[in-house]
């Protein structure tokens, strides 16, 4: 093995740049064993790979102008890495959901490769924070400052941060139902149902009583409410007309004062005059009348008032059953 002079050995080795060159210039001389003879060389021995790898990256106080050793660089880098790891999750948790801003310029990303994720989350209009403390304060104050602005769209999307009195100003029907409560609604429904049932029972009872006063050809003929009302109207009109006819006949007999024979004949004539009301009654009570074919309709309980019908007044006042005039009798 031949010995090379230090100058030639330094020229043949690759040149160190940056921080490696500074460390090589500041390191003390080393001893090299050549052919059993120990000689000093000005060339620095190769440092450990982990130290060189950590020192090669740019960080706070890691450049040639920093003047710090490998131990200081390692501690500073570890502190910066731990702080960056602690800062990135805090930024992601504190920042509310919203449209992702545009990425930062390439120059800022190249200068801070370890904080690239942090730079992309920051707004594009502001530069990247220089100190970690400022970045943490910015990430905490950003959601509070942008809540009132239009960055998140409508303010109604965050009702817990905004005061919205629209519900108090314009209450909806659903809120009224919630205010009433289920117990009040059930009690009101029960009261309404009982009142309607009681009213319907009264109406049905009144129709049943009216049906008993209307004579029909089949006595047990089934009639609807509409038919009961129509037959009752016809029956009342028939009775009113019959009473008017009887009153007119009595007035005529009192004026004429005829003999009993003529009076008897007049009585027969009165009976003949009473035939049309009988025919009208038969027409009203016949099952083929127009009332039997009428459609059933809903009758209002207030459309009529229950009045006692006359008890067979037509039969008691029929002309054939009237007493004879005074002085009349068989001769």
Swiss-Prot record:
Gene Ontology CC terms: chromatin; nucleoplasm; nucleus; transcription regulator complex
Expression by tissue: Leukemic stem cell.
Origin superkingdom: Eukaryota
Biased composition (Gly residues): 56-70, 263-275
Pfam family, one: HLH
Modified residues (Phosphoserine): 12, 122, 172
Post-translational modification: Phosphorylated on serine residues. Phosphorylation of Ser-122 is strongly stimulated by hypoxia. Ubiquitinated; subsequent to hypoxia-dependent phosphorylation of Ser-122, ubiquitination targets the protein for rapid degradation via the ubiquitin system. This process may be characteristic for microvascular endothelial cells, since it could not be observed in large vessel endothelial cells.
Record's subcellular location: Nucleus
Assigned keywords, A-Z: Chromosomal rearrangement, Developmental protein, Differentiation, DNA-binding, Nucleus, Phosphoprotein, Proto-oncogene, Transcription, Transcription regulation, Ubl conjugation
InterPro entries: bHLH_dom (IPR011598), HLH_DNA-bd_sf (IPR036638), TAL-like (IPR040238)
Sequence segments annotated as region (Disordered): 1-27, 40-86, 249-331
One Gene Ontology term of the molecular function aspect: histone deacetylase binding
Pathology linked to this chain's protein: A chromosomal aberration involving TAL1 may be a cause of some T-cell acute lymphoblastic leukemias (T-ALL). Translocation t(1;14)(p32;q11) with T-cell receptor alpha chain (TCRA) genes.
Quaternary organization: Efficient DNA binding requires dimerization with another bHLH protein. Forms heterodimers with TCF3. Binds to the LIM domain containing protein LMO2 and to DRG1. Can assemble in a complex with LDB1 and LMO2. Component of a TAL-1 complex composed at least of CBFA2T3, LDB1, TAL1 and TCF3. Interacts with SBNO2; this interaction inhibits TAL1 occupancy of the DCSTAMP promoter, leading to the activation of the DCSTAMP promoter by the transcription factor MITF.
Function of the protein: Implicated in the genesis of hemopoietic malignancies. It may play an important role in hemopoietic differentiation. Serves as a positive regulator of erythroid differentiation.
Entry domain remark: The helix-loop-helix domain is necessary and sufficient for the interaction with DRG1.
The protein, known as: T-cell acute lymphocytic leukemia protein 1
Organism placement in taxonomy: Eukaryota, Metazoa, Chordata, Craniata, Vertebrata
Gene: TAL1
